[in-house]
Amino acid sequence: MKLTPREKDKLLIFTAALLAERRRARGLKLNYPEAVAFITAALMEAARDGRTVAEVMHYGTTLLTRDDVMDGVPEMIPDIQVEATFPDGTKLVTVHHPIP
């Protein structure tokens, strides 16, 4: 299987997000990399599902709460940026304060 660097990045994000999802389901609080991967993967999937950029940006603020992550993690993530593939092309999505 030959993958481009971008495809490898997407697989790495997906793998980290899957691990984060499983840990969250077990009741564990997510650390910084897990929280970023969880949110990033959800944003990429929402874009693929056909949501608008504005919808994806709003959705990014609803995924995790302070109760879902370790202390200090929300302050470590002032924003998340991801190039997501929408039906009409790839666009940069920025979510400010993803963990309110």
UniProtKB/Swiss-Prot annotation:
Entries under InterPro entries matching the protein: Urease_gamma, Urease_gamma/gamma-beta_su, Urease_gamma_sf, Urease_subunit
Keyword Ligase: no
SUPFAM superfamilies: Urease, gamma-subunit
EC number(s) from the headed UniProt entry: 3.5.1.5
Annotated TM spans: none
GO biological process per UniProt: urea catabolic process
Pfam hit, one: Urease_gamma
Gene3D superfamilies on file: Urease, gamma-like subunit
Top-level division of the source organism's lineage: Bacteria
Catalysed reaction equations from the record: urea + 2 H2O + H(+) = hydrogencarbonate + 2 NH4(+)
A GO CC annotation given for this chain: cytoplasm
Principal EC category: hydrolase
One Gene Ontology MF term: urease activity
Pathway recorded for this protein: Nitrogen metabolism; urea degradation; CO(2) and NH(3) from urea (urease route): step 1/1
Primary localization class, coarse: cytoplasm
The entry's keywords: Cytoplasm, Hydrolase
Compartmental location: Cytoplasm
Family as reported in the entry's similarity comment: Belongs to the urease gamma subunit family.
NCBIfam families assigned to the protein according to its UniProt record, in alphabetical order: PRK13241.1 (NF009712), urease_gam (TIGR00193)
Subunit (UniProt): Heterotrimer of UreA (gamma), UreB (beta) and UreC (alpha) subunits. Three heterotrimers associate to form the active enzyme.
Cross-referenced HAMAP family: Urease_gamma
Protein name: Urease subunit gamma
Source organism of the structure: Burkholderia cenocepacia (strain ATCC BAA-245 / DSM 16553 / LMG 16656 / NCTC 13227 / J2315 / CF5610) (Burkholderia cepacia (strain J2315))
